């Protein structure tokens, strides 16, 4: 099986695939602004990110060649949060998923996850 699926935008079209992705927790990297630039989506409100979260999938938000597609990671989070009216909890889950689904060594993942938890504890 795959270690990670980049984009995975059309994965939501297949209920059997959704089940496999949920069961395996295979990370899906979603790049909202490049999807818009490349006309994968004509409107960010059609992004599968919120539904993927609601389905219990391991989705995260990424930038994809930000110099070409007009947005680094913060801009992608801002755009998708506004378009999908994501909750603070959903944003935190996306951030956590970005580290748990990364290829970082486990000790590095733990360090970054602890930092997220610390910020959340202080602010939410």
Predicted features along the sequence, with ranges:
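Active-site core of metal-dependent hydrolases
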Residues: 1-40
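Anion (oxyanion) recognition and catalysis
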Residues: 22, 53-54
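A post-motif C-terminal structural segment
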Residues: 31, 50-53
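Short beta-alpha connecting loops at secondary-structure transitions
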Residues: 32-38, 60-62, 78-83
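Charged helix-capping and loop-helix junction motifs
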Residues: 42-50
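Short acidic/histidine-rich active-site segments
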Residues: 57-72
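Short acidic alpha-helix initiation/capping motifs at coil-to-helix transition points
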Residues: 69-75, 89-91
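Mid-to-C-terminal alpha-helical segments outside catalytic/metal-binding sites
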Residues: 85-124
């Amino acid at each position: 099986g795959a270690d990670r699926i980049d984009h995975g935008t059309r994965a939501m079209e297949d209920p059997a695939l959704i089940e496999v992705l949920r069961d395996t927790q295979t990370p899906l990297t979603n790049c909202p602004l490049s999807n818009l630039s490349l006309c994968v989506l004509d409107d960010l409100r059609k992004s599968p990110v919120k539904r993927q979260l609601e389905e219990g999938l391991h989705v995260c938000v990424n930038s994809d060649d930000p110099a070409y597609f007009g947005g680094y990671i913060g801009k992608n989070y801002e755009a998708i949060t506004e378009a999908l009216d994501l909750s603070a909890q959903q944003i935190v889950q996306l951030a956590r998923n970005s580290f748990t689904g990364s290829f970082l060594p486990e000790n590095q993942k733990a360090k970054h996850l602890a930092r997220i938890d610390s910020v959340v504890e202080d602010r939410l």
